[in-house]
Amino acid sequence: MRIASLPLLLLTTLLVGVAGCQSQPAHDKLALENNYWKLVELHGKPVAVIDNQTEPHLILHADKKRVAGSGGCNRIMGSYSANADTVQFKQMASTMMACAQGMDTEQIFLRSLEGEQHWVTTHDTLTLSDKQGKVFARFSVAYLR
């Protein structure tokens, strides 16, 4: 009985060892969708969060292909389509509140989202660039639960 168990034990050990050797990705590429992306840089300049205003951010909701967020003063919303490396925001709209500060940055941010963008995530950063590869926005992630 012991001799018959030895091959089974060796086979089990071998299979467990091989399974442990399979490569696992060290860090998966962060998903564009279903994450809170805080705008931290716009056209090479850091983006400040104004006191008593919402930080500029985007959330791309995968289930309905809707985008929501803030330009810093106004809420923004619309739809989008995305693939492995491009995203296009569509039918973008915003509330129309006036704020004492940050309106220029908000308008630049909203205009920058027009057209097709190239996107890439590295570590906890989302980078958007135009068709020529010029980076215009960087975001940091805050994971949604």
Residue ranges and their predicted role:
Residues 1-3:
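N-terminal secretory signal peptides that target proteins for export/translocation
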Residues 5-7, 19-145:
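Lipid interaction determinants
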Residues 6-14:
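Sec-dependent N-terminal signal peptides
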